[in-house]
Amino acid sequence: MTEPLLTIDDLAVSYRARRERRTALEGLSLELGRGEVLALVGESGSGKSTTAQSIIGLLPEGGRIDRGSIALRLAGGPIDLARLEGRALEDIRGRRVALVPQDPGTSLNPVQTIGASVAAPLRIHRWGRPEAIRRRVVELLDRVGLDDPERRARQHPHELSGGMRQRALIAAAIALEPELIIADEPTSALDVTVQRRILDLLDDLRGELGSSVLLITHDLAVAAERADAIAVLRGGRLEEAGPTRAVLEQPASRYTATLLADAPALADESPRVPRPPAAPFVVVERLVHEYGRGADAHRAVDDVGFGIERGTTHALVGESGSGKTTIGRAVAGFHAPSAGGIRIGHRDVVAARRDRSLRRVVQLVSQNPFASLDPRRTVAQSIGEPLQNLGAPDGRRLDRRELASRVSAAIAHVALPPDAGDRLPRELSGGQRQRVAIARALIIEPAVVVLDEAVSALDVTVQAQILALLERLQGELGLTYLFITHDLAVVRRIADTVTVLRQGRVVETGTAEQVLLRPRHDYTRALLDAVPSPDWLRTPSAAGIDPTPLEVA
């Protein structure tokens, strides 16, 4: 390791939880070298984000540093960030230490222009006059690869794609050329090609600025490909730390070995063996969906068709803006397409879209269960709500005792603890909330489940558990899945058949084995090449194609 820029020594952090305090970090000690990347890896609740918040002085209400030090070594000598407060902390934040948060959708002010958001650290630190700041903002947006930066500076967040918004956050973070950049899950919600561009950008900027990067991630493949060193956290404690190759080649901790085993990878076992052909149960025919009208119309889905056999999993794969979610919501009956048809068995989904009975046939599980669950209702109330609204699968209205019995059975079916029904969503982990969303979808015994990025935000261990759960339920209940994802390693594990989308059109479709092992289209090959490899010895090869133009909004 080079001379350390950041040294964390015996850090302990706790949060107020009702009438007691809950320990979030206990005795954490780490070092990050100058100009290096340290990946902080662990599952949800391991303390990764708490570590970042402690460094930058942004612990949420009720959080406090109980002991330990966080030494940032600057030219004038080391500064203990754990002891800073008020103006002294504000002077460091943004100027010496900057944060790239996970979700640009919530981190950018929706009523502010992109230019105003990028300019915020420059204004706070009185970098220059308004005209000089305006020029600096345009320069920064250009530096992070946004086309037509002057126009982008005038736009609002909703006018940019997810990758473009993430670039804007990076522009704000590097505005004052800080010594330390904390990247908190900066690519977990992005598709593989945009993810690669964002990580390449961070690498380039690190080289230009000489900054160190603390990369917080649950993706071991990203850590393996990008980090000089890895630190593994579990339950607020450090499991192990060391050079990337040493940690991944010879993990000292059984927990690290488990994380490595759970990480989905294209190099893992072969895709599912193709089944003998059968008549499709779900049929999507020449689907078209347009947003807006007239000259402002945007065709998000253009002549898409595919079929799904009963009891199988069909994956829809593509970048942001490829039309995946639009198709999934149409199959679930949430909106009518502009043209084309959708059938489930003998039922016309488009014609039956407003029929409540369609909800018995097809259910949707979304990416963010926290947003889809009522925060004021208990888990049992949320799971039981579809039964209360629609009745039992045979149409009967259930009395309170039978409803409670079915909810308890649903909770057990998705392997949640028996007392989970009495909890609120905020009292559950991310993986537990996703299990609640699955139980809620399955309690009325649908034939088809649309899973829209249902595991993309979960750490590898929880992701593996949810995928195993979905496979078990499919085998027990004969479910048919439409699985929407940007993660090709997950597709390899769970899908029987695959359709690859690009800008609303089908690029290719076939069995998982055909598409993943023998892709016919350059775009599919480029998507496969962009997947971070968990093999830390692999040198990424160039596919010779840029899968899409730079994120176009």
Outline where the language-model segments fall.
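Helix-to-loop junction immediately C-terminal to a conserved catalytic motif
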Residues: 56, 60, 332
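ABC ATPase NBD coupling module
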Residues: 77-98, 124, 246-251, 294-298, ...
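Conserved ABC ATPase "signature" region
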Residues: 132-151, 401-419
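Conserved ABC transporter NBD signature motif
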Residues: 65-79, 340-348, 358
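ABC ATPase C-loop
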Residues: 168, 174-175, 442
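ABC ATPase "signature
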Residues: 238-242, 250, 506-510
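Conserved ABC ATPase signature
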Residues: 155-160, 164, 424-428, 432
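Conserved signature/switch motifs of ABC ATPase nucleotide-binding domains
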Residues: 94, 158, 176, 444
